[in-house]
């Protein structure tokens, strides 16, 4: 992690702000599709601030600059930001949200500007109200992105990668029935159509996959679905011949990506009652999700012309069908085999001093081991390969010229995942190749107990991830410890590794989203000792119905089915802290791992010996 000088960039940006009578300028992380992970061409916030984390918002005034981010990135931001920037640690006591900070800077009649394609319509409305409540002038839409103007010719070009059709043997469902179900929802909500701008929703709905955003098999696009038509806005030259044929077969029209705003304006006008029809005529409305950009909402007619709803596509995508669930099981077995081979190899290299390996070299080896497995497409995010103090940086990103050497005396954390045609993986294991300290063993075991407790939880249908979160934190809480990140996130099926709407954590949003059978989530408690070590244990699990002796309130009861097939680190487990039930759970899990993965290592004595050692009964 490096600090980048931003003085010249900020000076140029402020000049552009003054020329447009803007006193405060907002630079979000997201792209025009509200993507969590973005293409390099959309990395505006990183360019202007120097902060490379995946979450955060930059706000620039004529004499100040602030970067707001969450607890996952406090250490990273503190390292990467130069002295032009104030770090707003979101969620910390007495620290304003970036919206509050922005409104405070606008006090006294000042004007706030933003690129309207990068802020959702709901965020824009809430921010306008906050700005005016503090005596600010207004939030205004600036069509020219000012950071792009500063970036100039050095800005990366927009990717235009091929788009492939995902066959039914992987997707489990064709587009036509997906569209039928969506139209049934729209009919119930009495809206004319639904405008979709979220990339993974479009990829899922049309059974297409791309690579416009690194690690995310999505492509730049929009879609409009009405009772009679489905239109995909995309660069048609990117579509494979098979994709073209599939879309035609499923009655999907294709329009240029750039036409969405012009077509939206035309569509919105066509839905307005004419003078002949009179004001009594029934107004037809379009629906958008709460992630739709302010710019697109304005093109569709703004308030009164559209209804903002919870995306029915997002909800449907989160409930995996049986084909997708079986794909998740199978890809995690193959992925587990790759990780087991990697950890056995890495321990042999490090503990026996066969080679000097840094964090990047180790991560490259892991990618190569994954790549040999069936249906491998690529990684699902940049591998977090972190040793010692680097492991305490929650979203650490190793770089070749500055990363650390892996040694046998420090904790090693590996958070990694892959994209397979039949599913998406995400696994974290923390290991030690020598003799860990008692503090490290205790911390690891407390995290492990939380991981197991949540995995073993049984709960009534309707329970949210917010309610389940304490299962994972309870043992750390008993010691006055905690971690600054969520406990779980939804996972896509050969889609984004972070997928809504579900999650497990303390965010208010999770209190309104019940977990349901077919959901796939991570379970990943952790503990981080700044400057020393970090521990995280992550499994992927599927929500399923379970049998219980009783069914209070006639509600089904739910539980988890874990699909990650990688053993925990025996050296780091303090058995004296485990209950008999926890030991039995570990034994059952280890037997399952051994049964599912040992077939990959018939001719690999090193890996097989490591696997048998790590899965011995407790």
UniProtKB/Swiss-Prot annotation:
Domain of life per record: Eukaryota
Cofactor note: Binds 2 manganese ions per subunit.
Coiled-coil stretches noted in the UniProt entry, renumbered to this chain: none
PROSITE patterns, per database record: PROLINE_PEPTIDASE
One GO process term, biological-process aspect: proteolysis
UniProt catalytic activity: Release of any N-terminal amino acid, including proline, that is linked to proline, even from a dipeptide or tripeptide
Keywords from the named record: Aminopeptidase, Hydrolase, Manganese, Metal-binding, Metalloprotease, Protease
GO function term, MF aspect, one: metalloaminopeptidase activity
A cellular component term, taken from the record's GO annotations: cytoplasm
Ligand binding (Mn(2+) 2): 415, 426, 538
A Pfam family recorded for this sequence: Creatinase_N_2
InterPro entries cross-referenced by the UniProt entry: Creatin/AminoP/Spt16_N, Creatinase/aminopeptidase-like, Creatinase_N, Pept_M24, Pept_M24B, Peptidase_M24_C, Peptidase_M24B_aminopep-P_CS, X-Pro_aminopeptidase_P
Protein's UniProt keywords contain Metal-binding: yes
Named cofactor requirement(s): Mn(2+)
Known function: Catalyzes the removal of a penultimate prolyl residue from the N-termini of peptides.
Family: Belongs to the peptidase M24B family.
Name of this protein: Probable Xaa-Pro aminopeptidase P
Species of provenance: Pyricularia oryzae (strain 70-15 / ATCC MYA-4617 / FGSC 8958)
Classification of source organism: Eukaryota, Fungi, Dikarya, Ascomycota, Pezizomycotina
Record gene name: AMPP
């Amino acid at each position: 992690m490096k600090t980048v000088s931003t003085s010249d960039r900020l000076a140029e940006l402020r000049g552009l702000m003054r020329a447009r009578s803007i006193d405060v300028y907002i630079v979000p992380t997201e792209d025009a599709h509200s993507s969590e992970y973005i293409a390099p061409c959309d990395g505006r916030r990183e360019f202007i601030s120097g902060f490379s984390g995946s979450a955060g918002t930059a706000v620039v005034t004529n004499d100040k600059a602030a970067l707001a981010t969450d607890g996952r990135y406090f250490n990273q931001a503190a390292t990467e930001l130069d002295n032009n920037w104030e770090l707003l640690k979101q969620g910390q006591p007495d620290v304003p949200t970036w919206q509050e900070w922005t409104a405070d800077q606008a006090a006294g009649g000042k004007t706030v500007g933003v690129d309207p394609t990068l802020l959702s319509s709901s965020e824009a409305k809430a921010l306008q109200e906050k700005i005016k409540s503090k005596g600010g002038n207004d939030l205004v839409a600036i069509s020219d992105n000012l950071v792009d103007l500063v970036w100039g010719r050095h800005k990366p070009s927009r990717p235009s990668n091929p788009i492939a059709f995902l066959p039914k043997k992987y997707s489990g469902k064709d587009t036509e029935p997906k569209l039928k179900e969506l139209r049934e929802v729209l009919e119930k909500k009495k809206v004319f159509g639904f405008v979709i701008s979220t990339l993974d929703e479009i990829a899922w709905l049309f059974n297409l996959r791309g690579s416009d955003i690194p690690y995310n098999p999505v492509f730049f696009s929009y879609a409009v679905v009405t009772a009679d038509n489905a239109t995909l806005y995309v660069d048609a030259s990117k579509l494979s011949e098979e994709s073209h044929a599939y879309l035609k077969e499923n009655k999907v029209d294709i329009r240029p990506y750039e036409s969405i705003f012009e077509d939206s304006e035309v569509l919105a006008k066509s839905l307005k009652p004419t003078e002949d029809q009179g004001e009594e005529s029934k107004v037809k409305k379009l629906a958008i999700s709460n992630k739709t950009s302010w710019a697109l909402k304005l093109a569709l007619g703004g308030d009164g012309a559209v209804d903002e709803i919870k995306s029915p596509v997002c909800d449907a995508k989160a409930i995996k069908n049986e084909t997708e669930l079986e794909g998740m099981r199978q890809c995690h077995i193959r992925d587990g085999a790759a990780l087991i081979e990697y950890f056995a190899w890495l321990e042999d290299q490090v503990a026996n001093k066969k080679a000097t390996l840094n964090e990047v070299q180790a991560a490259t080896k892991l990618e190569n081991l994954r790549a040999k497995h069936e249906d491998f497409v690529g990684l699902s995010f940049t591998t977090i390969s972190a040793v010692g103090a680097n492991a305490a940086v929650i979203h650490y990103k190793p770089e070749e010229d500055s990363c650390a050497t892996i040694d046998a005396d420090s904790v090693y954390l590996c958070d990694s995942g892959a994209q397979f045609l039949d599913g998406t993986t995400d696994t974290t294991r923390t290991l030690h190749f020598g003799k860990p300290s008692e503090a490290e063993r205790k911390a690891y075991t407390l995290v492990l107990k939380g991981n197991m407790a949540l995995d073993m939880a049984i709960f009534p249908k309707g329970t949210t991830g917010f309610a389940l979160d304490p299962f994972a934190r309870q043992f750390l809480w008993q010691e006055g410890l905690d971690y600054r990140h969520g406990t779980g996130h939804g996972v896509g099926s050969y889609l984004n590794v972070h997928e809504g709407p579900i999650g497990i954590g303390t965010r208010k949003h999770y209190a309104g989203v019940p977990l349901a059978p077919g959901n796939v989530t991570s379970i990943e408690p952790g503990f981080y000792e700044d400057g020393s070590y970090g521990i995280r244990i992550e499994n992927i699990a599927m929500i399923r119905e379970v049998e219980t002796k009783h069914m209070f309130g006639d509600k089904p009861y739910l539980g988890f089915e874990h699909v990650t097939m990688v053993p925990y680190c025996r050296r780091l487990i303090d058995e004296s802290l485990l209950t008999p039930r926890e030991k039995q759970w570990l034994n059952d899990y280890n037997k399952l791992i051994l049964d599912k993965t040992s077939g990959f290592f018939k001719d690999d004595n090193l890996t097989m010996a490591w696997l048998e050692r790590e899965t011995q009964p407790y």
